Amino acid sequence: MPLQLLKYNPGIVKDVTEYATGKNGPFWVDSDLVRFKNGYPEKLGGWQKDTIFALNPSGNITSTETTIEGIARRMVYWRSNSDGEDRLVVGTHNHLLIIENGSLHDITPLRKTSTGLSNPIATTDGSTTVVITDNTHGAENGDWVVISGASATGGVSADDLNSYYGYQITRINVNSYSIVVPSAATSTVASGGGTVTVKYLIGVGAELGSQSSDPALGFGVGGWGEEAWGTPRSDALAGVNLDNSSWSIDLWGEDVLATVRNGAIYYWDTSAGVTNRAVLVSSLSSANSVPNVARTTVVSFPDRHFIAGGCQAYVVGGGVGNVDNMLVRWSTQEDFSVWNPTSTNTAGDQRLQVGTKIIAMVSAREETIISTDEAIYGMTF
């Protein structure tokens, strides 16, 4: 009996019976993890886990696998012009991280650094909770700190105390907080650690650290009878956060511009290396009238203006004013740090009319798409 060619039509038919498909077929009636190319089924491309390794307190790569800290909100991959290295920047709800050469580097900006703390570490025998004393530290619950220079205390090793990635804190009072280390102390020490430096990462005060938005805004929030009847509570008092923590991340050449939603704008210089953290754009020597607060940012293409949405207004004569959730501002062309409009540059601003706040901005082929909560705008230069 001669062979007969059976040519199946592409696609999966599920809305009629298998018998009925043969009337105009044959058709495929079931599949799993396939796609059709040139009329023929082929298996879907897969994925491979990317192994990343942790760093020790000295910043050297180890053989210990690790994962990113926090819920990833934004990732941007690029290959640097200067050294040809592949890099991935990841903004999570509480960190800004770089994956380079298979290792995980923390470039989260710093809020402040306390140096020369004398024996600020206290341990309790059998407990993994360690108390740090730093007067007027300014940290809030959920913030992160990185300790360096600490010596072994109460049986807790120096490597544990001086962890490269640091620790999330529990605030005790204005002068102290606690961290949880991997191994329990073997003795109680009221004051130890030697001369210690503590770096405080930006956190709650900089709009970073909220894993989810808080929908609990209606009747029944909090305990029954809390405060006086009809008295409105502030967001801070109520613990209410309308937006979760997120990032806008764009490349400026091979460098990184990153903005915390409802927070500040930061810059990371690739050529400076992963031992350096991102810094405020407003702290650069060339900075002029940079917004300190923005909902979102984007670099326009192909003209290269740096655009901020839902940001602080420009104050004539220099500086910034109040936040306007519908205001769009942009830097002068080819300089992300200069935002004061003059007759010789292209910086400027425009307030949008439809909506109450800017939600997102995306750089498209010939324009920048700006979305408010009620409208979509297209912006060109």
Regions found by a protein language model. Give the residues of each.
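N-terminal beta-propeller domains
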Residues: 1-113, 204-236, 267, 290-378
